[in-house]
């Protein structure tokens, strides 16, 4: 399949916007350097003549940037700390065409070889590249892919989707959704003086293998979990838990994935493994509605592979649930203070080294409004990550059919994937 770039436009706010800078919190600064989160929304053609009209989309995007003006800015350093320079330079919108059809993408597994998202040139420095880039790719079947590259220092997925959904509302001629974005980040400032109360294992180096694997080829898989299978997993977990405590869908699936990955990797019983679970702190910290920035913390249970494999599903799920339950307001405030005391927060940034074998990352997009953006021609048939897959990273994704099923998208070493898939369905 071939992708041909037809046009590129730097879209600027439709009206004058505030200047100055947006301060970045310690949580914002945890984002890796030179990194945009990559995802794609796919839409089937609805039969209309003006399907995803580029001019209309640019006009709506320009209007959306009036409220979300920091996206039109650029990164800059001040006193050796990153911030957003609100200079109004704009976001990039690329138009492209493909000689292939959406059906050829099958289950929409990430294809980094297909340029469905604009390439970011990091070589010229942080002040030169856009914080948000979009690509509208038209397929020969009439469908489109909307590729998104979001610079993570400015916003997490919740905030980015707030912006994209606002753009979609304006494109279809309805008022922007409430609430408006809130850029005041003082609610996530460290206390003065900082008072960390915990050791914060989430920011400690992850376990490593004593001898690196020689075969590092990776494979990607997307597995469907039906409503009945979820029910069976929950029942199995409940039957093995003397406390009789019901567990959430996320806790049960994360525990199940952790057990299956540990077994599939075949590591020694005494090998430590760390599970990374991103957690949205907006509710716990009572952040203002519309808070725009990163509010992601981490639950990170650590165990030996032997402990996770040899005990019941209920045990692994309890480890997950206990780690998440620990993230109360006191713990989250302590986390911010802990970061305040670090000389260089960027050294603690999560990345490929954090969740590769023997570790694991499980993130849920199930409650994110990933299927809300409707630009006037219907909702997406699929939305998901499109980056080069990192070994050990997995996503829980909603099913657009809304039938109670979910998808688990995961990347593992090729030598481990077949066994993982077999174990995953042994419910």
Curated annotation (Swiss-Prot):
Active site annotation, chain numbering: 152, 374
GO MF terms, alphabetically ordered: rosmarinate synthase activity
Highest taxon of the lineage: Eukaryota
pH dependence of function: Optimum pH is 7.1.
InterPro entries named among the record's database cross-references: CAT-like_dom_sf, Plant_Fungal_Acyltransferase
Catalytic activities: (2R)-3-(3,4-dihydroxyphenyl)lactate + (E)-caffeoyl-CoA = (R)-rosmarinate + CoA
Keyword Transferase: yes
Keywords of this entry: Acyltransferase, Transferase
Gene3D superfamilies reported in the protein's UniProt record: Chloramphenicol acetyltransferase-like domain (3.30.559.10)
This enzyme's EC code(s): 2.3.1.140
Thermal effects: Optimum temperature is 45 degrees Celsius.
Region (Disordered): 181-208
Uppermost EC category: transferase
Function: Catalyzes the formation of rosmarinic acid using caffeoyl-CoA and 3.4-dihydroxyphenyllactate as substrates. Can also use 4-coumaroyl-CoA and 4-hydroxyphenyllactate as substrates. Rosmarinic acid is an ester of caffeic acid and 3,4-dihydroxyphenyllactic acid.
Family assignment from sequence similarity: Belongs to the plant acyltransferase family.
Protein known as: Rosmarinate synthase
Organism expressing this protein natively: Melissa officinalis (Lemon balm)
Encoding gene per record: RAS
């Amino acid at each position: 399949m071939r992708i041909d770039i037809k046009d590129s436009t730097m879209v600027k706010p439709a009206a004058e916007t505030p200047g100055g800078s947006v301060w970045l919190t310690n949580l914002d600064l945890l984002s890796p350097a030179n990194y945009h989160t990559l995802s794609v929304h796919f839409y089937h053609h609805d039969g209309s003549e003006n399907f995803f009209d580029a001019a209309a989309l640019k006009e709506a995007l320009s209007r959306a940037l009036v409220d979300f003006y920091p996206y039109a800015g650029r990164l800059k350093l001040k006193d050796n700390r990153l911030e957003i320079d609100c200079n109004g330079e704009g976001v990039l919108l690329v138009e492209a065409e493909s000689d292939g059809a959406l059906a050829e993408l099958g289950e929409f597994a990430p294809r980094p070889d297909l340029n469905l998202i604009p390439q970011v040139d990091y070589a010229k420095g942080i002040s030169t590249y856009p914080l948000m880039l979009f690509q509208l790719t038209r397929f020969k079947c009439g469908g489109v892919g909307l590729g998104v590259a979001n610079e993570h220092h400015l916003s997490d997925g919740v905030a980015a989707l707030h912006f994209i959904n606002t753009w979609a509302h304006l494109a279809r001629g309805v008022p922007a959704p409430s609430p408006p974005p809130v850029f005041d980040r003082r609610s996530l400032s460290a206390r003065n003086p900082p008072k960390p109360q915990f050791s914060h294992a989430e920011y400690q180096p992850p376990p490593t293998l004593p001898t690196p694997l020689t075969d590092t080829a990776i494979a990607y898989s997307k597995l469907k979990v039906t409503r009945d299978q979820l029910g069976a997993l929950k029942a199995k977990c409940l039957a093995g838990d003397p406390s009789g405590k019901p567990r959430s869908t996320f806790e049960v699936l994360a525990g199940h994935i952790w057990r299956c990955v540990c077994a599939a990797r075949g590591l020694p019983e005494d090998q430590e493994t760390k599970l990374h679970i991103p957690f949205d702190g907006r509710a716990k910290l009572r952040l203002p509605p519309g808070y725009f920035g990163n509010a992601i913390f981490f639950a990170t249970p650590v165990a030996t592979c032997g402990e996770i494999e040899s005990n019941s599903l209920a045990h692994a799920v309890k480890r997950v649930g206990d780690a998440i339950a620990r993230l109360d307001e006191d713990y989250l405030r302590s986390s911010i203070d802990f970061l305040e005391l670090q000389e260089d927060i960027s050294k603690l940034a999560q990345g490929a080294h954090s969740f590769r074998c023997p570790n694991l990352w499980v993130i849920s997009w199930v409650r994110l409004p990933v299927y809300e953006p409707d630009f006037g021609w219907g909702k997406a048939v699929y939305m998901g990550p499109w980056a080069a897959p990192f070994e050990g990273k997995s996503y829980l994704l909603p099913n657009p059919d809304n039938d109670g099923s979910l998808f688990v998208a995961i990347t593992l070493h090729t030598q481990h994937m077949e066994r993982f898939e077999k174990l995953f369905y042994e419910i």
